[in-house]
């Protein structure tokens, strides 16, 4: 009998790195709304009283980026200097340039089907049977905790909540099956007047209790709520935020490997993003097809080349058929060229700002086509 602990974390929409991710994807969506052929690589930095957007964009349209940045920050909830950041008054610096012609010539081919990868790289996708959405439980519940914090803040139910928050949850496993929750950490920014005792009670009753099933909570479960005792200074006043700094939060919470490429601010010609979505789509369909209870998929690409340079499937001994046979079926069922992925998942749409918080995977929204299991039958029959 094997027992172990596994932990994942998440952060709220008001965390500095997530502010940056949301701004980068807001820029991408705003441009795609007007120009579906645009090439976008937008990075964001946020710090006290300041936002810097930088990167490379190739487009025929114009977007008021300063106004967009301010609206994004205000929607998150930073609307007053008392919170340490105010979207209405912060400085917005624009350092965006044009995409390199050397890159464009390898990506933009005369025939769309020949479109090459925008860069070299390796991407991973993962699925398992721990949750109904075929995601690992630790990252799933970590996301739900900070999402609940945001819901209560936006609704006004807990008016002392502020935008910045973090969660972490540790599960106990026995023979790869969840048997309980060992620890929950939740830190939330708050206004000055709330006491730690009141905050702790409210967080346990209003955030944790509705999200984490009581069957997993026992006398051994430890709760760490605002363990430093005070969290008034938060957001960009407390820490600098950068696009792409929460890549494990964005994916599988450490339960699967990561190729290193971030997602936000990148149009779907960038395989860092589109191929990672495709790898999740493949892995989820493999598990949904009953071919395995755990599946990790690796894809890799070379700049300017359409076909992936490698495809790997690992089912960790849970496969009902050989992993090499699953690879053969994947190649038969999925077109994993950049063009094939974009068409298969309908990625040239302004859908990306929604992905920038609470995880790119495991959220079965209509826009998140990579969460469908519509190719599981084809995998069974291939």
Curated annotation (Swiss-Prot):
Binding-site list for K(+): 43
Quaternary context: Homotetramer; dimer of dimers.
Record's subcellular location: Cytoplasm
Positions annotated to bind Mg(2+): 17
InterPro entries in alphabetical order: ADOMET_SYNTHASE_CS, S-AdoMet_synt_C, S-AdoMet_synt_central, S-AdoMet_synt_N, S-AdoMet_synthetase, S-AdoMet_synthetase_sfam
Entry-linked Pfam families: S-AdoMet_synt_C, S-AdoMet_synt_M, S-AdoMet_synt_N
Main localization category: cytoplasm
SUPFAM superfamilies: S-adenosylmethionine synthetase
Pathway: Amino-acid biosynthesis; S-adenosyl-L-methionine biosynthesis; S-adenosyl-L-methionine from L-methionine: step 1/1
Task performed by this protein: Catalyzes the formation of S-adenosylmethionine (AdoMet) from methionine and ATP. The overall synthetic reaction is composed of two sequential steps, AdoMet formation and the subsequent tripolyphosphate hydrolysis which occurs prior to release of AdoMet from the enzyme.
Catalysed transformations (reactions): L-methionine + ATP + H2O = S-adenosyl-L-methionine + phosphate + diphosphate
Gene Ontology biological process terms in this record: one-carbon metabolic process; S-adenosylmethionine biosynthetic process
Similarity annotation: Belongs to the AdoMet synthase family.
Binding, ATP: 15, 164-166, 230-231, 239, 245-246, 262, 266
Name listed for the protein in its UniProt record: S-adenosylmethionine synthase
Ranges where the record places region Flexible loop: 99-109
Key word Nucleotide-binding present: yes
Residues annotated for L-methionine binding in this entry: 56, 99, 239, 270
GO CC aspect terms: cytoplasm
Keyword Magnesium: yes
Keywords from the UniProt entry: ATP-binding, Cytoplasm, Magnesium, Metal-binding, Nucleotide-binding, One-carbon metabolism, Potassium, Transferase
């Amino acid at each position: 009998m094997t027992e172990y602990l596994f932990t994942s974390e998440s952060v709220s929409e008001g965390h500095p790195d997530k502010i940056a991710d949301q701004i980068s994807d807001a820029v991408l969506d705003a441009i795609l709304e007007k120009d579906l052929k645009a090439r976008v690589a937008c990075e964001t930095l946020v710090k006290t009283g300041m936002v810097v957007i930088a990167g490379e964009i190739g487009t025929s349209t114009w977007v008021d980026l300063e106004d967009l940045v301010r609206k994004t920050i205000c929607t998150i909830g930073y609307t007053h200097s008392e919170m340490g950041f105010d979207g209405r008054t912060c400085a917005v610096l624009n350092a965006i340039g044009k995409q390199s012609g050397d890159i464009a010539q390898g990506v933009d081919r005369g025939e769309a089907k020949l479109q090459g990868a925008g860069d070299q790289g390796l991407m991973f996708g993962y699925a398992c049977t721990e949750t109904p959405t075929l995601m690992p439980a630790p990252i799933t519940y970590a996301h739900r905790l900070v999402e609940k914090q945001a819901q209560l803040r936006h609704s006004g139910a807990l008016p002392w909540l502020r935008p910045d928050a973090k969660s972490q949850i540790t599960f106990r496993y026995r023979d790869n099956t969840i048997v309980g929750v060992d620890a929950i950490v939740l830190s939330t920014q708050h206004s000055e007047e709330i006491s730690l005792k009141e905050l702790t009670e409210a967080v346990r009753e209003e955030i944790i209790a509705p999200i984490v099933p009581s069957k997993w909570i026992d006398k051994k479960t430890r709760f760490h709520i605002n363990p430093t005792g005070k969290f008034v200074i938060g957001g960009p006043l407390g820490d600098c935020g950068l696009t792409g700094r929460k890549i494990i939060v964005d994916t599988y919470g450490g339960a699967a490997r990561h190729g290193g490429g971030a997602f936000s601010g990148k149009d779907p010609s960038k395989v860092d993003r589109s191929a990672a979505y495709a790898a999740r789509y493949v892995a989820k369909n493999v598990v949904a097809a009953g071919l395995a209870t755990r599946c990790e998929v690796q894809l890799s690409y070379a700049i300017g080349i359409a076909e992936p340079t490698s495809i790997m499937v690992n089912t960790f001994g849970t496969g009902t058929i050989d992993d090499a046979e699953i690879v053969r079926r994947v190649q038969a069922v999925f077109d994993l060229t950049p063009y094939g992925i974009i068409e298969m998942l309908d990625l040239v749409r302004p859908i990306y700002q929604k992905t920038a918080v609470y995880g790119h995977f495991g959220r079965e929204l209509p826009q998140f086509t990579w969460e469908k299991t519509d190719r599981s039958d084809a995998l069974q029959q291939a």
